[in-house]
């Protein structure tokens, strides 16, 4: 009689484990796996940004599950300057940024570099870390005014 109780208890444990596995798989399939979309409005043909350091660079970050945080850095090959970092407290599906040039003299010496934008969304994927999107764009700093001649 005790052998039958042990056998049936193992059966109940096995059925419970199966329900847990099915539940975890069903939950994992509902998670958002798409990375946030990063759009830089000043890009020329999707590659380079020509920046005169007077007008801000406009960046749009969006995702269906909401934006958790973002970071914008400029690297000129010798130094890395953090232009903007924020942890978004409200649940926003899109964030619009205007990145202005910093006033430090190190940044003003650069003639080109790369702009790196990293964004995380509110998804529970990656062990609640969220999905990550990284966009790197070349920046050409153009301080010269155009020369126009009237004939």
Regions found by a protein language model. Name each.
Residues 63-78:
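Solvent-exposed loop/turn segments flanking beta-strands in beta-repeat/beta-sandwich domains
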Residues 3-19:
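N-terminal Sec-pathway targeting helices
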